[in-house]
């Protein structure tokens, strides 16, 4: 799994599909936002946000990656043990978090809205998340 390759392929697909893509961020800005939220910007997070700055609109799968400004806004207050909110599916039917692992990766956690099921890990790394997303988005967007 190569995150940069999967992101490049998805970016091309999202542009063709008409998703409103935001410009990439500078590495220092990515590091600053994640540090402010009490979590390091892993190399995967840096690759993600220096390739794609987020989405202004959902893609054809009804998933939307948030901008760094939205991440900072959504993660105000005490840090969650489940990680940093970074995207949503189906207009917030559930949200996704990035949590740094002991080996320096960012695992992806699906977190339902309050009152719903407990959070579920959908991918051990961001590279795995986007590889699965590229093959069949439902694998990661609708965890069971």
Show which residues each predicted segment covers.
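Compact, glycine/acidic-enriched structural inserts
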Residues: 112-136
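N-terminal non-cleavable signal-anchor helices
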Residues: 96, 109, 121-123, 141
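A surface-exposed partner-binding patch
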Residues: 1-102, 140-142
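Intrinsically disordered, low-complexity regulatory segments enriched in Ser/Thr/Pro
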Residues: 104-113
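A short, sequence-level motif marking secondary-structure junctions
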Residues: 100-104, 126-128
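A ubiquitous, low-specificity "background" feature that marks scattered single residues
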Residues: 94, 117, 134, 141-144
């Amino acid at each position: 799994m190569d995150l940069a390759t999967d992101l490049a392929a998805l970016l091309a697909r999202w542009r063709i599909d008409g998703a409103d893509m935001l410009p990439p961020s500078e590495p220092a800005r990515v590091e600053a936002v994640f540090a402010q939220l009490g979590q390091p910007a892993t190399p995967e997070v840096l690759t993600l946000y220096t390739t794609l700055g987020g989405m202004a609109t959902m893609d054809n799968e009804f998933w939307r990656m948030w901008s760094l400004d939205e991440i900072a806004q959504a993660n105000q207050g005490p840090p969650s043990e489940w990680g940093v909110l970074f995207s949503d599916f189906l207009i917030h039917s559930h949200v996704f978090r990035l949590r740094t692992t002991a080996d320096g990766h960012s695992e992806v956690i699906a977190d339902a809205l309050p009152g719903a099921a407990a959070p579920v890990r959908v991918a051990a790394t961001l590279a795995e998340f986007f590889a699965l997303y590229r093959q069949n988005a439902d694998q990661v967007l609708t965890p069971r």
